[in-house]
Amino acid sequence: MRIIVLGAGVIGVTSAYFLAKAGHEVTVLDRQAGPALETSYANAGEVSPGYSSPWAAPGIPMKAAKWLFMKHAPLIVRPTLDPVTWRWMLQMLANCTSARYAVNKGRMVRIAEYSRDVLMQLRADTGIRYDERMQGTLEVFRSQKQLDGIAKDIAVLKADGVPFEVLDREGCVQVEPGLKPAAHKIVGGLRLPGDETGDCFLFTNALAKLAEGLGVRFVYNVDLKRLRRDGDRIAAVETAQGDYIADSYVAALGSYMPGFLAPLGLDLPIYPVKGYSITVPILDEAKAPVSTVMDEYYKIAITRLGSRIRVGGMAEIARFNKDLPPARQATLTLSVEDLFGGAGDQKKAEFWCGLRPMTPDGTPIIGKTKFGNLFLNGGHGTLGWTMSCGSARLLSDIISGAKPEISTEGLDLSRYR
């Protein structure tokens, strides 16, 4: 079958790879000059199934109200009268109940755990390298109240069979020796030894090369215009460079997917939640993190990527704004210097932002549409890297008519009807 994949981020490239492995003839179209040049470029670097949780959670509305008045807030909401923004935020608030949280988290953990298994098999089969580390993640808490608040998360981890360790201050320093000078600032932590880290940009580029070896054709610098329909099927992709025709089509356009598909009558509740990162070269190995340390107070992840430290986080509700305010960089710098002072060269920091494609319930949208040959793979939010391989393998099975290895319940667009 001839298949066109729209988008060459980590979701699009993994989709293309697994579709090619299944025997399909795949073409990938992207507006950028190469793979992973938008949201996949400099994310936090975590592959963290255990931390796959919806942002829409009990207590979040109250926390969000407090964050609005913090100098170094993890959430920034820019004032707007935009109806799309308000609709999405109201949908998210509707998911902030205990019952909805449990359902949504269960779906997210299902796809995330599967995705890690698929990634491990891919690594074993291909030897792909991407500054990867398999040394777990550690979430540190600065107050006893924060530490006590993880009870509901631990219950879910137990129910899902996810290995975890609750550590005291000394235990945190034992797994992350670089925390020793700042040990007095934390009270304990939650460690997930099965989590991984890695550079999503390196991974996506390496996988694109492997996909080319399977016959996948990548066409870059393409100005996508629209999908042309013929009844209940898609007939072609119209671009400024001409039409592209296939038997089936996969949309993996991240935050831009709702706008691109709206003319077809598809209503996708995916919103571009802006996140920031800085990447700094390591100055002192002894002071640097071993893997990923998540600062619960600032909602920031500090990740070791080879000879670099990636610091990523925050959430800004501002539509497609991609400004880089110095105040956001200051928050990232504050967090990493507070916990790993002197580990990285802040004078050489690379400051970046990306638009995470978020659904109001946190679960991605994977699968069929009302058009018989149009499929979706998007809305992964902050977990695109974590969920990429599993989402792609699942979608490949759906398109190929094979039986998926996990349940697809609650993962497609029909859950919003």
UniProtKB/Swiss-Prot annotation:
Example GO BP: D-alanine catabolic process
Q: Which Pfam families match?
A: DAO
Catalyzed chemical reaction(s):
a D-alpha-amino acid + A + H2O = a 2-oxocarboxylate + AH2 + NH4(+)
Pathway recorded for this protein:
Amino-acid degradation; D-alanine degradation; NH(3) and pyruvate from D-alanine: step 1/1
> Known EC number(s)?
1.4.99.-
Alphabetically ordered keywords of this record: FAD, Flavoprotein, Oxidoreductase
Do you know which InterPro entries this protein is assigned to? DadA, FAD-dep_OxRdtase, FAD/NAD-bd_sf
Cofactor(s), by name = FAD
Question: Which molecular-function annotations from GO does this UniProt entry contain?
Answer: D-amino-acid dehydrogenase activity
Any signal peptide, and if so, which residues? Answer: none
Instruction: Write down the SUPFAM superfamilies for this protein, in alphabetical order.
Output: FAD-linked reductases, C-terminal domain, FAD/NAD(P)-binding domain
Q: Which GO terms describe its cellular component?
A: cytoplasm; plasma membrane
What residues bind FAD, as annotated? 3-17
Q: Where are the transmembrane segments?
A: none
Q: Which family does it belong to?
A: Belongs to the DadA oxidoreductase family.
The function of this protein is:
Oxidative deamination of D-amino acids.
Among PANTHER family, the record links this protein to:
D-AMINO ACID DEHYDROGENASE, SARCOSINE DEHYDROGENASE-RELATED
Name this protein carries in UniProt: D-amino acid dehydrogenase
Give the species this sequence originates from: Azorhizobium caulinodans (strain ATCC 43989 / DSM 5975 / JCM 20966 / LMG 6465 / NBRC 14845 / NCIMB 13405 / ORS 571)
